[in-house]
Amino acid sequence: MMNQQQQQQQPPTTSPTQQQQLTQLQTHQYFQNKFKLFYKRELDEADPLEIYWRECYDKIELLLLNSSEAEINNYLIEKSASVESSGNNDQSNKFHTEVTIGFLYAILLGSPQNIALSHQYFKSLTFFTKDSLALFCSLLKKLIADKFQKLNDTPRQQVVWIINELIATNHQDCESVTSIILRHIYGGNFTSKNLSLSHSMLNMFLTHRQWLNSRPLLIPTILYNFLRLIQDHISRPQGLHNPTHLKDEINFCLDLLKNKFQECLVIGRDLIRLLQYLSTKTIEFEQLWKDLNSKPTTFAPGYYDIIQSMKTPTPKHFLQSRLSPEMELQVLYILKEVKFGNQKRYQQWFVTKYLVTPESESLIPDIIRYICCVYHPPNHVLCSDIVPRWAIIGWLLKHCKSDAWRNYSKLSLFLDWLYFEPKIDSIMNIEPAILLMAGSVKKYADMTIDLVEFIVGTLLDSYDIQRKDAIRQGIHNSFATVLEKGVVQSLSHVFPPDSLGPSLFEKVKHYFHQFLTNSPIHQLHSQQQQLQQQQLQQPQQPQQQQQPPQYKPYPQQPINKQLPLQMSPQQQSQQQLQQQQLQQQLQQQQQQQQPPQQPPPQQQPQQQPPQQQPQQQPQQQQPQLNISTGNLPNIQQPMVKSPPLSSNTLVSPTSSSSPTSSNLPTNNSRVLNKSGVDIHHVSNLSPQVISQKPQSQQTPSLHSSSQSVLQQKSPPLKETSLFEQQQPSQQLPSQIVKNSPPNLSMTNENISNPPPPPHAKISSDHASPLINSSNSNITTPNPDSQSQIPIPPPISQSPSTKNIDVIMSELNDEPPKLSKSSPTQSNIIVPPPTHKPPQTTISSSSPLLQPQTQPQPQTQPQPQTLQQSTTPSLSSSSTPTIPISPPLLPTQLEIDIQPPPPPPSSQPLQPPPPPPPSQNIKDETLNSLIELNSSIKLDEEIKMEIPDILLTIGSKPQFQPTNITITLGSILSNFNEKISKQPNITLQNELTDSLTQYLSQVLKPELQIDLSTTPSLLSLFCNFQVIHHIFRATFSPTDNSITTTTTTTAAATTTTTTTPTIVKPMFNILKELYKIYPSIGFKIMIWSIITSPGGLNITNNGCTYIYPDIECDNSFSNSDDNESTNNNNNGVEQKPQQQQQQQQQQQINENTHNNNNNNNNNNNNNNNNNNENNITNNSQNITIKEESIFKIEKLLESVQDSNGNRNILGNYLNFHSNLLGGQPPPPPPPQQPNKIVEQIISDCIEANNVGAFNYLVPILYKSFSNLLVGNSDFLYLVLSCINPRQHFRICNKISMGEFRVFGNEMKSLISQSFKWESFEQNYLWQMLIAEDSVYSGMIVKEYPFIISKLDPYNNSEVLQNLTITLKETKFYDFNIFSETLLLNDYFYTFVFCLFSFWLKNNTTQTFNYINQIFDFYLSNNNNNNNNNRKLVERILYFYNIFLKKYGEERIKWSDMIDSDRVSKVLQRSTNSNLFQKYSNLGSLVLPSQSSNIKNDNNPTLSKHQNSDDDSNPKKRFRKE
């Protein structure tokens, strides 16, 4: 019986295979029950990330399950303190990481029904963390980005709950976490998980709407995502979406659009794409779309049309947000790694995962937008065999089964084409579409046809009728850009007629006829050919068959930027007199000339009678090219010549040749003369380049080479003489009109010239236009005469005009003829011409410009037969390979020209006397050429009309912006004098308004805040600016001295008794300018500072500052010497005595060579920037920025040291007080609104935009102590804008007692600072500690108030700085000690840190406080009803922790602990567990009673893992 029972009790025997299977099943079941974070199938292994997280959780699982919140916090802090005390940072970081991961894992696995437990874990983690949850948020972001779709339902819900908690606590990483999780709301996905996540996020945003409104960068991202989700939810299948949720989404988006439209504009053109789609689906968005088109200004003040948004490219992160991280990774893998031809299987995998359902087709437009605008392949990918972007887009379009989504996908593809601007948009955004059309022509012609039909039939015709022209222009720009950049070589194969069909191809030709060429380089030449064909089709005007369109020469680069000056009335009258003399001379020559010799027979058909010239003239206009749009003009439209400008209008010849001009030819178009030389450079040719040669003696090789060049460069042009290109009426304007052919003669508008004689015929075989210049006479060749003498007209040289005869004489092989000029101008002495044989021809190897060679004076030639013409002639016969002359050296610009006496008017042909032997004729000729070229550069911005009323206070040259730096001071002085003597108020107001308008235009570049053009900080503080003239005229030096003296007298008082007066007329101008440019406010502030005693000194010229003699590094002296030497206008000099002498000498040179120095004045800002960039430091490795900062700081310190307690901002304060209507009222309390303080803050914001605010803070606090000390708004501005370097500088100045920040308002400022960001609180407390070091006891006095307002979780920086303050103070008393001990458990670390410090460093004082508490406890019988009992327990508790932490150190414990008193307290207690609770303390004071306590509880042991009572943290830290 016993054996049978034993056999029944034995387990059944199993085979090894069965045991192995059982073990595997148990392990799998264990993992399935333990690892619940990610979704796993039965065959899947546990995720390595979850395994590691689970191990971290297991280490604190027992603590989390068996302890209260306070016990968890105490254990973690004690454990963290013990790890940190070991000195091993790696171990400390590992412990922090493991605890953080454990809490995150515990929260993720928490049940949504037990939110309290998750909240407790999150609160404990917040209390424990030492990096403000930075590690926690980084782990959470990585989890969401990589594995969110693998999470189970409960962790997914907990992730949303964690984000909600981060938003509730206003954590700094909540925006990034929110943006990442929004990417996991899939488009075209109607699963329950996806819809639930969408609704949860929407409810979260609705709950925290105030937080969302404070996040302007997050609002557009959320709006774009939910607009895209509404697009799916509207077209949802029946029953897959809750209508209530859809209504909430619509209302949420509409609310954001109506209230935060300005923030949403950053989305750009894709916002309009979504709104246009939704307007056709819902009534709400339809009404919004109507309001957006009819009343756009109601949405945003500066928003006038949706075209603004359509011209704004959508930033990449918006388009990226609609693809999940996993989807984006797979798309990028195909575009970066898969070779062309192998992409089919990858496409199939992608379709299987993301594009299975019909609803998922809405993802295709998002993917196309991502491919076009987000991913731009680098060059090595473009050059490889990787699958191109256009192939993937073509596959996506083929995948669209629905016509609606297919059309919407094509709109996504061409969205960037509609308003394409090359300067704003990227060509990579439009490249896939054009390559898709070009690459699909051969194999997939239907794709190309479909896309072309979409462009022509939908986008250009019916997409937006109201903005049809703008869309056509944008598509035109797109095609022009892809052709220009060489994306495709031609559009002929993109629009094949055979594939498109007749009707579609006709539409294409209608819209894109100008692009249907073999190469975009020949577009302009094709226009010329079409123009010639039109001329051939006009039988009534046969003379126009060979007449080409006259093109403007390509803009030549001037040698310098010297600007021509206006002619005075006296000079204009002299010019008119010379013009009359010219006409008389021409008439006399016409009467003396013989009949012209008939040309050879083969040239007769090319001659044209002069009576047909008026019909030819309209054909000479150059076709206009719109640079901004890239459009060529309609060649069928006649070109109308603009009327000539008046002689008083200041026009530069290069105004039409500026790169921004709208009538420039393209870069590929060049205008050649008969020799094949680009006429853009004719003005630089030397006298030996072109020789005068009759037509009959020209070599055949010259003619053939010319034709070959023309055939290569451009279509054949009809050869036209210069005379035939003149105006029919022969009224020759003095200046070139911007959109007119070159003016070939010079005359005055007031002098009517006679028409040319009927026998004036000039052949046009080998003549071509040579130069385009204003007020120039160009002579034409006479091919019928064997030799001739060019008769130059009189030269009228005025400040605004230059004569061209010298240049034309240089183009001849003859020396130039003498010209007449005004006696007030510099004339050019030219020797008489000498006839030379016509066989002179210069080869291509000949030098073009030889200024060293001086032509010898020649005798007057014999009279010869001239062709009867009203214009002198010139023969041009040079080889077609003439190189361009080299640029002239700057030293050639300073050649002095001595004006000779004018020749008698009665003998116009009499040669002038020979020049003096010392005069360099060639240099004079060269100088004339230089002056001509230097006068043809004039910016469009300075061509302004000066009102006549302003000419009463200055001349036109003085009002030129290039001279305004020097002349504005005298202009303002004349203005003040004029106003004071003008009794008529109306005239005063008119003069003031005119001067204000002028100054607002001239000073716009200087006063308009633009980070791209704003001068550097060093220039702002150390260089003279034009606006300083106005400041000096408004605040006179006398007023400044009165202000300084008054302020010094009143330095002991808190308010200024008197304020300086200002010049009222100038103040009115300054006030109006301040309304336009608010930056004037802080510029007055800076000017008042740097011009105070100890600052910059003004030089004698009134437009230059001298840097004070400040002791600094030698490196700055050397660099500044070079800087001041190179800068004649705005330099800052380091050595005042030597540099001031140099400055005075430069001023003398400036008065002598005023015209040459105008160019320097035109580049004041450039010189300032160059001067700063030229600062070098060879002795130390200091960057230029650091040197600039050092220089500014030394200057400001010099000003403060030199002024003491004087208010150096009196002018600035007076300016704002006058703006407010008078003297400033007494300052209100600092926290009350003050208009002057508001103005100061506004100006400081403007100063912060250029980086100057930080330097002004100490002076502002010192000068406006009664206004700014204790002001929270100004302090917040300082803290939010300050950088660490300036903060350190300000704290040093506060600690030295130079100024105060808090004053008597410390409590209110601290109270408000609790709402600020953590770094702002940290900066504030460092400034408060600095001020407390001067005014001792500030913080200690308000310690109870501060500690009562503190939140240890949100104000950890404040707690840290408060700890530093209490450690350093010598004024802590018994009240502070007792209040610190009575703080709650959340301040455990703070209390223990202070208790340990006081006990070790202030042993005697702390020891007395503790004994005092113990004595009171022992003497009080009713000790259970007062706070003394709690104080005793805290002291015992911290004594015990102190002994445990520092037990191994050699400390004389008798000086810190009174064993008798402690033992009495322990014995008197009725708690039986007291000795076990304070075992470390009990073993020290009661060794006999602690014998039963285990040895490992000795205070010398630092580890407590082996302690029985430490095994349960809940029991260990339980409070009585």
UniProtKB/Swiss-Prot annotation:
Main subcellular localisation: nucleus
Compositional bias per record (Polar residues), positions renumbered to this chain: 626-639, 736-752, 819-828, 1489-1504
Source species, domain of life: Eukaryota
InterPro entries: HEAT_Ints3_C, INTS3, INTS3_N
The keyword Nucleus is annotated on this UniProt entry: yes
This protein's UniProt keywords: Cytoplasm, Nucleus
Protein name: Integrator complex subunit 3 homolog
UniProt organism field: Dictyostelium discoideum
